[in-house]
């Protein structure tokens, strides 16, 4: 059973007004099969975007039903060291993306995303990814 960490970049296409049916179906499929996971930075990014208190609580309830991969102090330090090595090799990405990728690698999760930075990381390190970019980029 392979678990997935669903990045914010994929989640955004699960919610109106930006729904992409293929991405939404994949997220729903993973959740129904109990294969979907989340980590605290993604939880934060999604919850802070709620448009009302009611939406916040509904979203929180749903997200907390997923497999949880909290970030520890040790994770921050190890992810920073890992990111530094990748930056020296020329890879540029947002700090939080390095942390999320590190969590996925550490727990051997497949990272479902719509962010090209993760594909670039996966070319350099043993990060397993499933890209949704083909569904959101114009041909």
Tell what function each PLM region has.
Residues 1-38, 48-61, 136-139:
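Short, well-structured N-terminal submotif of metal-dependent ribonuclease cores
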Residues 24, 39, 43, 56-59, ...:
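A general structural signal for well-ordered alpha-helical segments in protein cores
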């Amino acid at each position: 059973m392979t678990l997935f960490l669903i990045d914010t970049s994929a989640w955004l296409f699960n919610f109106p007004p930006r729904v992409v049916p293929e991405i939404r179906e994949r997220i729903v499929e993973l959740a129904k099969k109990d294969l979907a996971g989340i980590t605290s930075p993604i939880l934060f990014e999604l919850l802070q975007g709620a448009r009302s208190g009611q939406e916040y609580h509904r979203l929180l309830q749903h997200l907390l039903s997923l497999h949880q991969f909290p970030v520890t102090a040790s994770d921050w330090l190890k992810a920073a060291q890992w990111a530094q090595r990748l930056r020296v090799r020329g890879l540029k990405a947002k700090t939080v993306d390095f942390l999320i990728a590190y969590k996925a690698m550490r727990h051997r999760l497949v990272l479902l995303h719509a962010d090209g930075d993760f594909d670039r990381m996966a070319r350099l390190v043993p990060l397993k990814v499933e890209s949704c970019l083909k569904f959101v980029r114009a041909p």
